[in-house]
């Protein structure tokens, strides 16, 4: 099938799994509970101390007891970190980590509303990265699970922008058998 599905992003899945392993290997909860670590992360986020908030979210996730939506909080913290720096290397890392955390949130989600939120988050990140087809697929899958007017509106905008279109026309009228060639936005199959 020529349709792109949000879950077909193998490079993202691999990078997200590597990020999860990095968290497990590099963060030690030292007996602290998810609730305590999450509360600390939220306080640090309110203070816009993104590096420390990220560290606390990651440490909470390292407990193995964290809810799936905590991954989305981490993704949001990485996005705020991205917006708060002008360092291009850090921006690239933050952009990647935000997507990887959202992907891990999708992988960890069990309840339909958790899957929907993770798909919406992933769709927004794909959209910001100008990966419209992946964004469309993630939004579509999320909207199948939960109605969200803002996402539905963006989905319609992307769907219209990506609609099957004629992108170019070439005409060869100088030969004995004139020819026309149409270039489409997608494969015909």
What are these regions (language model features)?
Residues 33, 40, 60, 74, ...:
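Structural register within alpha-helical repeat arrays
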Residues 47, 81, 85-88, 92, ...:
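Structural motif corresponding to the intra-repeat A-B loop/turn of tetratricopeptide repeats
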Residues 53, 91-94, 98, 135:
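Single-residue signature of alpha-solenoid repeat helices
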Residues 1-51:
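N-terminal leader/linker segments that initiate helical-solenoid repeat arrays
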Residues 10-22, 28, 44, 65-66, ...:
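N-terminal non-catalytic regions of secreted/periplasmic and cell-surface proteins
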Residues 22-29, 58-71, 88, 101-113, ...:
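Flexible helix-coil transition and linker loops at the boundaries of alpha-helical arrays
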